[in-house]
C-alpha cells in the first residue's frame, strides 16, 4: 500500500471504490457516515457495489430503493438500520458465526475496499479502530485498499485495534459525534420486569454475557 502524505477530500478518496467491488463498512459506533454519504453522492458512476458489514448505526441512506442498482447490501447481521431493506428483498443476509467471518474475508469473500472511521494518528503514526474492532481487524488485514475517515472524537482503544497510516491508501479528515444508542427509550414495563427478576438471580462478582435486544439493554 502507498504511504499517505496528506488528507484528501472525500470525492478523491472514494475513487478507490469501483463498480463491481466488494466494500467492507466499519460498523456500530464507528459507522463512517461521512464516507457513506459521499459514496451515495457518487452513485451515478457506480454499479453493483457490494457492501458488507455486521451492524451499522443511524441512517445508512444507501439502503433506499433508489440506490439498489448501484449498491447491494450483504449484511452479516440484520440490524435495525437495514431490516426493512432485507425484508423487502433489496438486501441480503449471510447467516454466519462471528468467529467464522475472518475466514470468509480470507478465503471466500475477498474485500476490495475497506471504509473505516479511525482516530487521528499518534506520534508513532498509529490510528485506533476505536469502539468497533470485532471483524474490522480482519477486514483491515485482507482489504486491497483502505479508505479512512479520521475523526478526533473516535476513542483510542487498546489491544489489537491499531492501524498505521502506512496501511491507509486514503485519509479524509471529518470530525463528528459518533452514533449513540439511548436504551432508556426502548425498554418498556415488560422488559424492566424481566430484568428485575433476572437481576435477583445474579450473584455479586458474576461475569455476564449480554446479547442484543431490548431485554439485555
Annotated model-derived regions:
Residues 1-217:
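Conserved alpha/beta enzyme-core scaffold
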